[in-house]
């Protein structure tokens, strides 16, 4: 049996899948299987996979069940001791699996090991931004405020965690299914972090019509579920958790194609009502500057300012190296 099962859910992702698969097949660690779950795609994914000669790649086709359902299918078919997830448009550094396996082999008590993640745009170009989190060991206090496992593509999970904590909740959508899963694992197992960007997360402009209320409700479900099983001594974190969730939500209208800065301001207001102390946080200051830029320059000007800042960040990073 392979040591690692790599689960890739795919829904009409053929534009990015070849590069994603290549980043897996060129891993320095070779003892793995790839379980690609074709989640009801209509873009010829099956035909493309059939042309891959590598016997480690296995295809499962199902009717569309969403990201959680596809991941759960992958988990059910996985035979590895460790399970790593990779979204169909993200990329891995060649040493990603090797370093994570070594971490789990050397630390038998660890349930999940994650890495830093670098942000790329839709065309695969670096934005210059790297998400860095340092929390490890008992991380529940940190993860209830912020999903330190920034992307599902950075996580490698010990198989027994799913046997103990259950699998992904198919009733949750709107990008919170990861957060819910990691919270449940964090309540039972320590985490480790590899402090280097071994994953490239592809950022897309979201569609114009997003149901912000549904997204907010998904956050609410996760928070209430987490605190329902948390010891009373941790309940003081609930207000801060809601506040941080609403700061996170406030970015979503600014990242959509039809940017809605008024909705962003509404989420920001709610965040500070839940937790006034967040007013002085770096995240709230960044959000305030982004909203101000939108008000000053409009939607097109805001996008140009972001592009200018990303370019400046890339040049600074190249100079620093």
Residue locations for each model-derived region?
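C-terminal subregions of glycosyltransferases and related glycan-biosynthesis enzymes
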Residues: 203-321
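N-proximal low-complexity "stem/linker" segments adjacent to membrane-targeting elements
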Residues: 1-25
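Conserved donor NDP-sugar-binding/catalytic core segment of glycosyltransferases
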Residues: 95-127
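The conserved acidic donor/metal-binding loop of glycosyltransferases
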Residues: 87-91, 116
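Glycine-rich, basic loop-to-helix element that forms the pyrophosphate-binding segment
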Residues: 62-78, 99
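A conserved acidic beta->alpha catalytic loop
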Residues: 23, 38-47, 87
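Conserved nucleotide-sugar donor-binding catalytic segment
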Residues: 76, 115, 129, 133-222
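Short aromatic/hydrophobic "clamp" motif used to bind/position activated sugar donors
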Residues: 83
């Amino acid at each position: 049996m392979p040591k690692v099962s790599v689960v890739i859910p795919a829904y009409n992702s053929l534009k990015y899948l070849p590069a994603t698969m290549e980043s897996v097949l060129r891993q320095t660690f070779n003892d793995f299987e790839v379980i690609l779950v074709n989640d009801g795609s209509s873009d010829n994914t099956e035909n493309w996979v059939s042309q891959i000669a590598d016997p480690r790649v296995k295809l499962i086709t199902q009717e569309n069940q969403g990201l959680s359902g596809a991941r759960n299918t992958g988990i059910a078919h996985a035979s590895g001791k460790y399970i790593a997830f990779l979204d169909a448009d993200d990329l891995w550094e060649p040493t990603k699996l090797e370093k994570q396996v070594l971490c789990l082999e050397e630390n038998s008590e660890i349930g999940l090991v994650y890495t830093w993640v670098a942000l790329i745009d839709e065309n695969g170009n670096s934005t210059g931004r790297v998400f860095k989190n340092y929390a490890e060991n008992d991380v529940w206090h940190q993860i209830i405020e912020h999903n330190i496992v920034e992307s599902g593509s950075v996580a490698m999970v010990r198989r027994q965690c799913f046997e103990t904590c259950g699998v992904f909740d198919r009733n949750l959508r709107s990008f919170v299914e990861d957060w819910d899963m990691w919270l449940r694992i964090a309540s039972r197992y320590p985490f480790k972090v590899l402090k280097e960007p071994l994953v490239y997360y592809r950022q897309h402009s979201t569609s114009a019509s997003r149901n912000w209320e549904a997204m907010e409700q998904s956050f609410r479900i996760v928070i209430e579920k987490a605190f329902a099983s948390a010891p009373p001594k941790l309940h003081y974190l609930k207000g801060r958790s809601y506040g941080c969730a609403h700061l996170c939500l406030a970015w979503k209208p600014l990242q959509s194609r039809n940017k809605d800065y008024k909705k962003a301001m509404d989420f920001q207001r709610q965040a500070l009502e839940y937790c006034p102390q967040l007013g002085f946080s770096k995240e709230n200051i960044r959000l305030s500057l982004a909203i101000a830029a939108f008000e000053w320059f409009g939607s097109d000007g805001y996008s140009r300012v972001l592009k200018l800042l990303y370019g400046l960040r890339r040049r600074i990073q190249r100079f620093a190296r």
